[in-house]
Regions:
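Short hydrophobic/aromatic-rich beta-strand segments that constitute the beta-sheet cores
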Residues: 1-2, 19, 54, 115-117
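Conserved, surface-exposed functional patches that form binding/active-site neighborhoods
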Residues: 28
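Short, isolated positions in well-ordered beta-strands
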Residues: 24-25, 159
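A motif-centric feature for acidic-aromatic and gly/ser/thr-rich catalytic loops and repeats
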Residues: 8, 14, 19-20, 24, ...
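N-terminal presequences and immediately downstream first alpha-helices
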Residues: 1-11
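Intrinsic-disorder/low-complexity loop/linker signature
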Residues: 5, 21, 38, 155-156, ...
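Short aromatic-centered micro-motifs
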Residues: 2-3, 17, 151-152
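Short turn/helix-capping motifs enriched in Asx and small/polar residues
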Residues: 58-73, 96, 104-106, 110-176
Length: 176
């Protein structure tokens, strides 16, 4: 990305993030570690995996986020530049004025509540549209990777709607 005349090249190597060849942070399941000072920053998430609060290792609240149902930022207090992982824990890409979330399989536009690529399993649900996010029910559903959505109850339990051969489905079926 460009800021003024300066160009920054970001590389993602697993959980490590490099900018211009220098390690800047390492992502973990609970937050991230900044390489410049080796400090841990914790994500406090809601039942859908939305990063609601970011807390520094010393207990200082660095960021508080509130979301519209389809993932648009309703408000973000303190510094909006603390970290880019927001709705469903996905990276919010603000390049060129676009607020798109990167789900891996495809990009998502929260202002439209739509994907920017066809649903890979869209032939199974043609009545819902090929670009609809979470069957137009973002309050009770999540889509962890842009490929399939799941129901989430108020306790944060994910209910599998379709059985596949994926390991997470096999584990779910086994009761683990």
């Amino acid at each position: 990305y460009k800021t003024g005349n300066a160009t920054t090249i970001t590389d993602y190597c697993g959980n490590a993030i490099y900018e211009n060849g220098v390690l800047v942070k390492v992502l973990t399941g609970d937050g991230y570690i900044t390489a410049s000072d080796n400090q841990f920053h914790y994500f406090i998430q809601d039942h859908q995996g939305n990063n609601r609060v970011v807390v520094a290792q010393n207990g200082t609240v660095e960021e508080v986020n509130d979301y519209y149902p389809f993932g648009g930022l309703l408000s973000s207090s303190l510094s909006n530049n603390v970290q880019p992982y927001k709705y469903n824990g996905k990276e919010l890409n603000r390049d060129n004025g676009l607020d798109w979330y990167d789900y891996g399989a495809r990009m998502y536009d929260a202002s439209l509540g739509r994907w920017h690529a066809v649903d890979p399993s869209g032939e199974k649900y043609p009545a819902l549209g090929l670009y609809a996010y979470c069957k137009n029910s973002p309050i009770i559903r999540i889509d962890p990777d842009g490929k399939d959505d799941y129901v989430v109850n108020a306790n944060g339990v994910v209910y599998l709607m379709r059985k596949t051969d994926r390991i997470v489905d096999v584990l779910y079926a086994s009761g683990i």
